[in-house]
Each structure stands twice: as C-alpha cells, then as structure tokens.
A protein has these predicted regions:
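Substrate-binding/catalytic cleft of secreted carbohydrate-active enzymes
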Residues: 1-122
C-alpha cells in the first residue's frame, strides 16, 4: 500500500485511494479494524486525498459500521438503496463505485431507478 501511494500520489488523475473491492471482510463487524488500518496508511502517506472502497452489501456495511470507517462509502450496485443508506452514514458521502451495468443498457440511463431486473439485454 505504501509503495502504491508513493508511486501515484503526485498523479493529478488520482482523486482518491481505494483500499478494496467487494472484500469478504465487509461482512464481519470486527474487520472494520483492517479497513481503518489501510485507510490510515493512505492518510499518512497522502493526507490530501480521501479513501474509499467498493462494497457490494450496502445494508450490511452500514449496519456493522464498515462503511462508516471510510472517508467515502463506495457502493457497488443497488442504487435504489443509496438514499436510505446515505442518511445512516456519519460522513454523508456516497460514491456509486460500480453501477452502470445494473441500471442501463448501452449508455441508456433510466431514472428514477426501479427495483426490478431488465426484461432483456440488447
């Protein structure tokens, strides 16, 4: 992590650091310590950028405080849950880290997002 941050921290295209994507630890309440530890490394090595991670279980990570540890809670999929979970987060910042494939087809975005599967894929 230290080497990664040192290598890219002067790159203007880096807007935040990501410490993981859909890690199994997100389900375990005690594993917030690991997320906090990785985030602290990022802050120590580059105090100018926030830290996120992609979490694919928004209800679980909000209820067990895993998302509350992050500077920016990154939610993968389930955009219909963003609003309710946003209100529960102390930092009140949410990033849709992986979303397009679940709510669009070939660049066509439909809002508000309805909670149902697509009838067909183009």
């Amino acid at each position: 992590m230290v080497n990664l941050v040192h290598h890219f921290r002067n790159n203007p295209s880096v807007v935040m650091w990501c410490i993981g994507n859909e890690v199994p630890n997100q389900w375990n309440e005690g594993d917030t310590k690991i997320a906090k530890w990785l985030q602290d490394i990022c802050h120590r090595e580059d105090p100018t950028r926030p830290v996120t991670q992609g979490m694919d279980a928004p209800d679980a990570v909000v209820n067990n405080n895993f998302a509350a540890v992050m500077d920016v809670a990154g939610f993968n999929y389930r955009p219909f849950k963003y609003k309710v979970n946003y209100k529960k987060l102390p930092q009140r910042i949410v990033l849709g880290s992986e979303t397009a494939s679940t709510v669009s087809s070939r660049g066509v975005y439909k809002f508000p997002v309805e909670r149902k599967a697509m009838a067909k894929y183009d």
